[in-house]
Amino acid sequence: MILRGARQVGKTTLVSSFGESYTHFIELNLEKCEDASLVERSNSVQELVNFLALKNEISPKDFPNTLLFIDEIQESEKAISFLRYFYEDFPELNVIAAGSLLEHTLKKTKNYPVGRINYLYLFPLNFQEYLEAQGKNNLLERFRNVPVDDIAHELLMKEFHTYCIIGGMPEIVANYVANKDLLSLPQIYESIWNTYKDDVIKYADSKSEENVMKHIVNTAASFVDQRIKFQNFGHSNYKSREVSKAFNNLDAAKVIQVIYPCTNVEPPILPDYKKSPRLQFLDTGILNFDLNIQADLLLMKDLSEAYKGAIIPHIINQEVLSLNTTDYKKTNFWVRDKTQSSAEVDLLIAHGKFLIPVEIKSGKTGSLKSLHQFVNQAPHPFAVRMYGGKFNIEETVTPEGKPYLLMNLPYYLGTYLKQYINYFITKYNVE
């Protein structure tokens, strides 16, 4: 199995913790010269396994109770090609590899073990995991009751407010849980963000491409509230092709992803790559740090208007992305680009034969013009608004006269969107 995810989302810590359940735990870190050299000079998997077994005093009969962890596997094409032989020659030995920026190495790996590997994906902590990290188990249990009750709502809103500001990077959350001191976090953000900047440019094919990537990571945060154009991105002179290629590298690294809209109102969700995309950072806390708005956010009672209304939609998309642990899929949004009636719905959720529109608004008074355009075209009467209020369901009508059902959800329910949609459709028998 390969555990995939951006740097510093907790892959190594997670596998090391899991390794405690085995009698024997062997770790190779391919960023360390000694471990990398061991792999490179091994002529076969048999030779490597025999050496590791001898070094760690393990016999073949112990393999079922042994976990071999190969960390930073993106550093070695040979290690990746070895994975198929672990599967074929030592099926009783448990092997987990972890890596970031894997796409770049996989392109160059000749003997890639297709069909021999399972993938799991790891993301920054979502809100549920953030509550669990704080030991808020009773509140988490109330969160998981569908629908959530009014008593828990205020406490959940307060916790989500802080989560929106600091984000879900494990080192950040661990520090905050231990010290409850937001002033101690900027140095950690700086270290994490600089690591990402240094990492991604390693995979540029030329100095010119490196410069484009540097420009993007230094300016992209300012454009999270809008759809982008590649040509002259960030007020530069870079051409569309240059920027597109650089964004592809950043997207593969999961540091800054490019999200394309769809225009259909029925499944399947089909991204339209001719339309202008929008950007999704790995973590909203890093985004807030890069925008230098965390101090301002601390003073706000309601984050719905934070940074031109972009922060809450960004964190909700991050929440939805975090659920893709076995099959990585980007989030989707819907657009209608017409001169007289353009529209944009923040999020689409596929549910059976329906595409469910999710609009993210500051309150019940916010305009639902775009949502209404989707509802008018959709073959079902179902829509969701995520806002800063309590859970409720209302029967309403679009300005064009189409009756529909609107489920209003508090912002903090991003990871439970599918459960609520299922609850709603079941309750109202909308099939």
Predicted regions and their residues:
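Interdomain hinge/linker elements that couple catalytic modules in large macromolecular machines
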Residues: 132-313, 321, 332-335, 340
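Conserved lysine of the Walker
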Residues: 11
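Conserved P-loop NTPase "ATPase switch" module shared by AAA+ and STAND
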Residues: 60-79
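Short regulatory helix/loop adjacent to the ATP-binding pocket of P-loop NTPases
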Residues: 103-119, 131-136
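Sensor-1/coupling segment of RecA-like P-loop NTPase cores
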Residues: 89-110
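A cross-kingdom feature that marks ATP-driven nucleic-acid transaction machinery
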Residues: 1-2, 6-8, 17-23, 251-431
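Conserved catalytic segments around the Walker B and adjacent sensor/switch elements
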Residues: 21-36
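Short glycine-rich substrate-engagement loop in P-loop NTPases that contacts/grips substrate
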Residues: 32-64
